[in-house]
Amino acid sequence: MSMGGGSNHEFGQWLDQQLVPLATSSGSLMVELLHGNLDIWVKEAKHLPNMICYRNKLVGGISFSELGRRIRKVDGEKSSKFTSDPYVTVSISGAVIGRTFVISNSENPVWMQHFDVPVAHSAAEVHFVVKDNDPIGSKIIGVVGIPTKQLCSGNRIEGLFPILNSSGKPCRKGAMLSLSIQYTPMERMRLYQKGVGSGVECVGVPGTYFPLRKGGRVTLYQDAHVDDGTLPSVHLDGGIQYRHGKCWEDMADAIRRARRLIYITGWSVFHPVRLVRRNNDPTEGTLGELLKVKSQEGVRVLVLVWDDPTSMSFPGFSTKGLMNTSDEETRRFFKHSSVQVLLCPRYGGKGHSFIKKSEVETIYTHHQKTMIVDAEAAQNRRKIVAFVGGLDLCNGRFDTPKHSLFGTLKTLHKDDFHNPNFVTTEDVGPREPWHDLHSKIDGPAAYDVLANFEERWMASKPRGIGKGRTSFDDSLLRINRIPDIMGLSEASSANDNDPESWHVQVFRSIDSTSVKGFPKDPEEATGRNLLCGKNILIDMSIHAAYVKAIRSAQHFIYIENQYFLGSSFNWDSNKDLGANNLIPMEIALKIANKIRARENFAAYIVIPMWPEGAPTSKPIQRILYWQHKTMQMMYQTIYKALLEVGLDGQLEPQDFLNFFCLGNREVGTREVPDGTVNVYNCPRKPPQPNAAQVQALKSRRFMIYVHSKGMVVDDEFVLIGSANINQRSLEGTRDTEIAMGGYQPHHSWAKKGSRPRGQIFGYRMSLWAEHLGFLEQEFEEPENMECVRRVRQLSELNWGQYAAEEVTEMSGHLLKYPVQVDKTGKVSSLPGCETFPDLGGKIIGSFLTLQENLTI
């Protein structure tokens, strides 16, 4: 028995797409929307054909079966294959929603595998595709189709069904699949009817690897630093005033106070970065110096960084790499110290084809951003505290809510200039402002973040000549053997009677190639809520957390994310792209259902003006094209609901859903008569000025890059992590990710019976204060139409100021995303502004030929 199947280039994409090249019904079937959950059992198959018989055709004198035997021998697998190695994929609208494990050498396999799957798909059938696993490419044995019309009755459909071949006939006499399937629509699911943080008894997100942990505390951060007094005060319940956290200062303080361990994961970790920046005080050490000092004090310091395959370091030769993560430079800095740095490549799964392994190792990354330390606890003991979010400890990330373009180049951002969108320098600018979200977990859930680090560290293997000589197996401290460090069961930092206590849950996108500790037995893995992929096990709990929170939302959703694309199965074209995450469709259907119920609801989504890089480049134009398709699908879903209830003449889709971006503009001397550029009253010749740089200096404007990965629901639930809203971050087999979701049980709608005003309310209001420049009472009720229209009005005014010829100082940064949405939900270019100011590139993107998995 093994997990998942082999590669399948012939019939579909790797994990998320299953094209069915045959008819399972002789007549036309009605397309139905399934929005809810499918409860599925794939039980067993009988009398499957022996697929080896179909493969014994010669290729260069070698039969397919012999070729497969040789491949398995190279991979170290047993080569005794006499018949089919069957497994089953379950798909709807071409999107794979479930996959059984492989049973080797069996024509009568028994799986007895259960799936409880969220769906938001329009389809005529649910397909059960029986396949034969093989190293040179899985083959479809046959298909069973269950009409969605039958499922909509709500009755359980079960029994033995004939497995049909490409001719619509049984693939073999007596070939049958035993299955059971039942559809439960959203309106009948109690799990989603009481809100996200439904009181003390809430169980969190069910079916995940890490459970909900009660009795914690959470600190929420916006940007790397917030100066005192720069944002308006926000008053919370209980007479408390919201405190704006100082993320990097808190992280530096946590490092200094650590006595036992400091564990860091990152997409990038850069040793020269300064976490504390007050008046550019040179006495504040760099991250690298701080970690070396702590290591010399006896603290175990482990740093786990993604190994960019394009960066290399050999004696006398080194390359930075395409992604500029400085991984090799950081490794060299710590080489002769007691700080242990492990550059961790992204590896493909065992049994994957060479093409698939190459794709994983060159395209996908380790994207988690965490720091775990021991901290002071009661009775002279220590406890585990964890930081989780979107901020890497590297250059270009430090910023404040002011998001200056030019004014901090010689102070806060001296030696930390970052703008990869076009060629410019720190002498000239503008820098790329950076907006991000982060969190600190104090309590039992911090131990799950620690467990994630330990599982990843044990699975990581260095790459390259000389990198494998040191053993990393004994580097991890055995926490359970250190008496002064509290264990998980002792770690509660607050009880349920404390009004400031939190319930927190840790989520991941990761697979068994990147962790050590997942169960070997696929059936046991199912009990740990892991999914089967092709020869791997998958934790997709970040996606599950987003879906559960959106479905439970009763009032509003506020999202900040670096990317926003998905639900391609419901686009008007490119349905088979494979960007199958449910998040955009779930938001659109949530709004549509609220419209039908004639209840207020609003979604606010903040994204970057464009993905980082040259907006005219092929990859970015293609991402923008997918983003446009996603927006179009959502707005049209909302318009259909308005039309259905007869409100299309009174309301429009933007009364419920709005997209925004962030930008800034700074007044200052632009160009002096002799052609030099005046920066800080010190004229300098710009090095080889280019058109984009000249235009940006003239206009004194630039986007604020939204790197956030977070969501607030109903001011009672927050989700913050490293995952973007795209397939790369949510599928579990691509980029590795981590996130936290949490709420305060005493500050929920269920507990109060009215609007909660706890820490999450304060956080969301503080973010709005940063983006809009001030607060109004209307902002306290985001679901109300008055608030939606007011925020949109302000964002349109800000966009007008940003795009104007005249340079004026901007007090608000929230810009209406520059597309036009008409009353029928059609999304098109903004008249007179089809391309991005200064840098160009179509705002709605272009369909360009490029490897799809790179851009979704």
From Swiss-Prot:
- Residues noted as binding Ca(2+) in the record, renumbered to the chain: 223, 403, 435, 770
- What results from gene inactivation? No effect on tolerance to aluminum.
Q: In which residues is a 1,2-diacyl-sn-glycero-3-phosphate bound?
A: 367, 562, 707
Question: What is said about the domains?
Answer: C2 domain is a calcium-binding fold, and the binding promotes the protein association with membranes. In PLD gamma, all the calcium-coordinating acidic amino acids are conserved.
> What are the PLD phosphodiesterase domain coordinates in residue numbering?
362-397, 702-729
Q: A Gene Ontology molecular-function term?
A: phospholipase D activity
Q: How does activity depend on pH?
A: Optimum pH is 6.5 - 7.5.
- Which ranges carry the C2 domain? 21-161
Q: Which cysteines are joined by disulfide bonds?
A: none
**Any known activators or inhibitors?**
Inhibited by neomycin.
Descriptive protein name: Phospholipase D gamma 2
Lineage, top-rank taxon, reads Eukaryota
User: What is one Pfam family matched by this protein?
Assistant: C2
Q: Which reaction does it catalyse?
A: a 1,2-diacyl-sn-glycero-3-phosphocholine + H2O = a 1,2-diacyl-sn-glycero-3-phosphate + choline + H(+)
Question: Transmembrane among the record's keywords?
Answer: no
Kindly identify the residues recorded as the active site: 367, 369, 374, 707, 709, 714
Q: Which gene encodes it?
A: PLDGAMMA2
Expression induction or repression: Activated by wounding, heavy metal, methyl salicylate, osmotic and salt stresses. Up-regulated by aluminum stress.
One Gene Ontology biological process:
membrane lipid metabolic process
Any single Gene Ontology cellular-component annotation: membrane
Give the matching InterPro entries: C2_dom, C2_domain_sf, PLipase_D/transphosphatidylase, PLipase_D_C, PLipase_D_fam, PLipase_D_pln
Q: State what this protein does.
A: Hydrolyzes glycerol-phospholipids at the terminal phosphodiesteric bond to generate phosphatidic acids (PA). Plays an important role in various cellular processes, including phytohormone action, vesicular trafficking, secretion, cytoskeletal arrangement, meiosis, tumor promotion, pathogenesis, membrane deterioration and senescence. Can use phosphatidylserine but prefers ethanolamine-containing lipids as substrates. Can use phosphatidylcholine (PC) as substrates in the presence of phosphatidylethanolamine (PE) and PIP2.
Q: Which family does it belong to?
A: Belongs to the phospholipase D family. C2-PLD subfamily.
Q: What is its main location?
A: cytoplasm
